[in-house]
Amino acid sequence: MMVLDGVFERHPKLKGASVELGAGWVPEMLKRLDYVVKTWSRVDKNLSEIKRKPSEQLIEQMAFTPFHHEDVGMLIDTSHPELYLFSSDYPHVEGTTDPIGRFERFLADYDENIKNLFYSENFLRLFPNSRI
């Protein structure tokens, strides 16, 4: 709703993350949000005022944490590498004993730049005053 209500348009410095919800749904959500704005902006005044595509807003201002069993490589391929952040629930059981190894399975064919985005750079882009 923040996208469709124009929150990210009005506050371009606002950053955030969707954590512990998985990310398998993100690529399709981006397509649907873009479609909604394109289709309904002809009849909805608020949507007609949105200048940047919803997918562009989310790439610049949000990130999502996939579950360890979700293929982050496929998510990157079907959307954008700047959308995803590493996370783990370790030491909880759902965090597994090897959270990095779980994601590395899906990132084995990707270069170091993509891995750095996932493991640290995307987080630092959104939260530049953080220390990791």
Q: What role is predicted for each listed range?
A:
Residues 1-57, 71-82:
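Histidine/acidic residue-rich metal-binding segments in metalloenzymes
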Residues 60:
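Short beta-strand or tight-loop elements
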